[in-house]
């Protein structure tokens, strides 16, 4: 530890102690908050089922930065490189299309054995795993419908895929000793004016009920469902709307997934957390950065990311909220994208933990909104960066932009060889 860091750390401890904050306790609490990194940033959501196939489902990865992962070994190596540069606890979020098999496997036939390497890798790296059925980029999703499909056989295919995915998820949870959160998102919807909005939702309701009909050990597996406002090609009608899934998660007591990019641009999920928590047992968050639409830009340390973190910490939702990331930028170094976004999420959590929330609550309850605003703004100038640097030091990761040197070296030695 450098003398400069020691001095900054001691000063930060004193400054935060003056407003009633124990920085050591804040760092202990930060170690209770894993962030689930998404594997699909590493290869632009290509997966290994059909890497040359087109990405469908109303989502899009833009850019053509060289060096994307082409197989599971490369993807795991890239993830390891990124994780070395991110302090504190982490998880990995997998999609079903990231299976490994020497022969083609139909999505309704995926089994834990197809993800054995991921499980062993996660155990070796002390990671939890989360999972997702992949209801997109497939011939049977080409017409824009999956779990709400009017064709019984096609709908059953996707039901069986989600059932098989639950078994994989439970396998991860059992093997790793931490529950896997399995999130169901479907692209189902219509491009133009829709006459019958009810029937697809009735089919989706029945399909989801069949998917989750078998009770699984909650210590191994957690079901989550995710809404969306619209997607490319489904601008006019989305079957799985916010109202649909809020009602579903409430009535079935599943987890509800809130994605930062899946709402109208004037809406923010930070404002939805406390409302949803009154009705559902758990939340899954997909922290992202929409720019005019759900374009999944790399997460910044911006107002909304901070507000999301503050909601989790202020209401002590550590055991009820699962923090995941969801962005895929193919225009920049993909490892850097992981590092930037994940570090920013963790910085936001740390800043929330360094807030004098009890004092702010007193001011709010007393109606002293002047002091509330003044203190909220003044705390932004407190030396939280020194606390972050100490956290990085203790986790043997670079504190500042030094991590970029490691990424550039990896790019030169490894990524540049991929063509």
UniProtKB/Swiss-Prot annotation:
Please list the disulfide bridges.
Answer: none
Q: Which Pfam families match?
A: RhaA
Cofactor(s) named in the record = Mn(2+)
Q: Which reaction does it catalyse?
A: L-rhamnopyranose = L-rhamnulose
Cellular-component GO terms for this entry: cytoplasm
Localization: Cytoplasm
Listed Gene3D superfamilies: Divalent-metal-dependent TIM barrel enzymes
The enzyme's main class, written as a single word, is: isomerase
Q: How is the cofactor bound?
A: Binds 1 Mn(2+) ion per subunit.
Q: What is this protein called?
A: L-rhamnose isomerase
Sites where the protein binds Mn(2+): 262, 294, 296
State if Cytoplasm is listed as a keyword: yes
Subunit comment: Homotetramer.
What does this protein's UniProt record list under function?
Catalyzes the interconversion of L-rhamnose and L-rhamnulose.
* Annotated keywords: Cytoplasm, Isomerase, Manganese, Metal-binding, Rhamnose metabolism
Under Gene Ontology molecular function, one entry of this record is:
manganese ion binding
Return one Gene Ontology term, BP aspect.
rhamnose catabolic process
Checking PANTHER family in the record gives: L-RHAMNOSE ISOMERASE
InterPro entries per record: L-rhamnose_isomerase, Rhamnose_isomerase, Xyl_isomerase-like_sf
**EC numbers for this chain:** 5.3.1.14
Record family assignment? Belongs to the rhamnose isomerase family.
Q: In which pathway does it act?
A: Carbohydrate degradation; L-rhamnose degradation; glycerone phosphate from L-rhamnose: step 1/3
UniProt key word Oxidoreductase: no
